[in-house]
């Protein structure tokens, strides 16, 4: 777990449903004890948002070291697809199911520390 603290300094967590929001909240509480900086949290369960989700993901790819999606892997893959460029530069992308039982590293598993996050 110490490896996670050293490698991932900033990130964003995005959820799409009420169950995903509960899981994301629990996960972020656990991660906050291990990280130097807290993850940003975006709740996309409602209809009112300051930015379109595609724009948020684009900005996250440019600014964050890690993106956690709590929800369907298909949604995450479609959202990140336009921005994927290089395994050494892209942020770690992790998808966690809504119940919090399974974590799938999508990008930057070894290089970006995504595999380490998936074991928490």
Model-derived segments and spans:
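Short, flexible, glycine/charge-rich loop motifs used to bind or transfer phosphoryl groups or to couple energy/partner
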Residues: 3-4, 57-58, 83-84
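N-terminal beta-loop-helix "entrance" segment that forms/cooperates
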Residues: 41-60
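Short, surface-exposed connector motifs at secondary-structure boundaries
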Residues: 8-10, 60-65
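Conserved mixed alpha/beta catalytic, RNA-binding, or beta-rich assembly cores of soluble enzyme
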Residues: 16, 20-29, 50-51, 62, ...
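N-terminal basic/disordered segments at the start of proteins
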Residues: 2-43
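Conserved small/polar residues in nucleotide/adenosyl-binding loops
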Residues: 120
């Amino acid at each position: 777990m110490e490896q996670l603290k050293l490698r991932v300094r900033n990130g964003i967590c995005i959820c799409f449903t009420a169950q995903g929001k509960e899981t994301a909240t629990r996960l972020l509480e656990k991660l906050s004890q291990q990280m130097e900086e807290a993850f940003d949290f975006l709740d996309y369960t409602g209809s009112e948002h300051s930015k379109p989700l595609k724009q948020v993901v684009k900005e996250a790819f440019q600014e964050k070291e890690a993106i956690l999606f709590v929800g369907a892997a298909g949604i995450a893959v479609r959202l990140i697809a336009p921005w994927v460029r290089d395994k050494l530069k892209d942020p770690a992308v992790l998808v966690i199911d809504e119940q919090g039982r399974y974590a799938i590293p999508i990008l930057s598993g070894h290089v970006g520390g995504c595999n380490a996050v998936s074991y928490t």
